[in-house]
């Protein structure tokens, strides 16, 4: 999840000019605006990457939530899908399931993207204006806007009761049992500890359940809309093939075409693509590198250190 959600959960268009395919090592400064094919271990032109993603039946666009360049790329992918003649649903982690009816009603009544954010209760905790352009694009083309996220009350119940809080038989139906093993559990646990700035408190095991439930429910919602295709806006951790939404999609609909994109911020300490954990095989299909958003170190506040203003 990303910094805005770490307290409880995990994991410019001018920079998007197409780049020639290239196998040479790249320094951090040269990675921004470049796309990497994880399986082929090579750079691809961003135009090619955009087209491949837009053509997928289900495109999972894994973002850093507060990076506006990521939202611009996501909108460009949705626009490319429309240009291809596709009419996918826009599915959003930023909207909790409990507000779906309110969002549908607002859209039917001709609400603005800002009013959709209010109907979705997404104006607090999310930078909703950054998502508004892609919502506007969906609305102007009469695409469904689909809520993906578990309601907060349900996540609180999972913390207290575990996966049983999903209801009788739901863990089986959602493939939570069939997909899981001790190795995956340990890997996700490490990711959550890292996302909490190294804090390995007892709550971590409960957050593993929350993350698994979120991913499985997101997959369920995507499957419901998959007949028309889906462009999903979600945190990068949710888009991971080895731990996130694709795991549950593959278990329940193995023939479904899913493409996972990781939008990755440049790390000044990295010397090339291979230094990024996202570039390991089996995590994503494509990576798209961007400059990092300006933000305070979230670990300062997490550890009780005053954050400079």
Q: Residue spans of the language-model regions?
A:
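N-terminal secretory signal peptides and thylakoid transit peptides that target proteins
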Residues: 1-14
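Hydrophobic h-region of N-terminal signal peptides that target proteins for export
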Residues: 13-21
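N- or domain-start disorder-to-order transition segments that initiate the globular core
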Residues: 20-56
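Zymogen propeptides
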Residues: 41-42, 46-82
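Membrane-embedded segments
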Residues: 67-71, 87-89, 97-104
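Short internal beta-strands
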Residues: 89-94, 260-262
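A substrate-binding/cap region within the structured catalytic cores of diverse enzymes
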Residues: 101-225
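C-terminal regions of proteins
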Residues: 217-220, 238-309
């Amino acid at each position: 999840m990303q910094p805005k959600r770490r307290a409880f959960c995990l994991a410019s268009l001018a920079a998007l000019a197409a780049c020639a395919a290239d196998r040479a090592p790249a320094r951090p400064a040269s990675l921004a605006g470049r796309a990497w094919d994880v399986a082929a271990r090579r750079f691809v032109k961003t135009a090619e990457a955009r087209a491949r993603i837009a053509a997928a039946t289900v495109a999972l666009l894994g973002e850093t939530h507060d990076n506006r360049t990521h939202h611009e790329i996501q909108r460009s992918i949705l626009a490319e899908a429309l240009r291809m003649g596709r009419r996918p649903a826009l599915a959003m982690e930023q909207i909790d399931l409990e507000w779906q009816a309110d969002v549908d009603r607002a859209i039917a009544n001709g609400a603005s993207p800002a009013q959709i954010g209010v109907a979705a209760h997404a104006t607090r905790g999310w930078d909703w204006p950054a998502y508004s352009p892609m919502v506007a694009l969906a609305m102007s083309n009469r695409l469904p806007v689909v809520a993906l996220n578990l309601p907060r009350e349900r996540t609180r119940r999972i913390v207290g009761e575990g996966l049983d809080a999903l209801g009788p038989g739901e863990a089986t139906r959602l493939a939570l049992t069939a997909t899981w093993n001790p190795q995956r559990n340990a890997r996700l646990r490490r990711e959550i500890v890292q996302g909490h700035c190294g804090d390995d408190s007892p709550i971590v095991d409960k957050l593993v359940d929350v993350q698994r439930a979120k991913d499985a429910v997101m997959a369920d919602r995507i499957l419901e809309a998959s007949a028309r295709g889906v462009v999903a806006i979600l945190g990068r951790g949710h888009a991971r093939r080895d731990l996130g939404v694709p795991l549950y999609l593959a278990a329940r609909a193995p023939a479904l075409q899913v493409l996972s994109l990781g939008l990755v911020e440049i790390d000044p300490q990295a010397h090339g693509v291979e230094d990024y954990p996202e570039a390991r095989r089996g995590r994503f299909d494509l990576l798209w590198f961007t400059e990092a958003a300006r933000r305070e170190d979230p670990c300062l506040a997490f550890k009780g250190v005053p954050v400079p203003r």
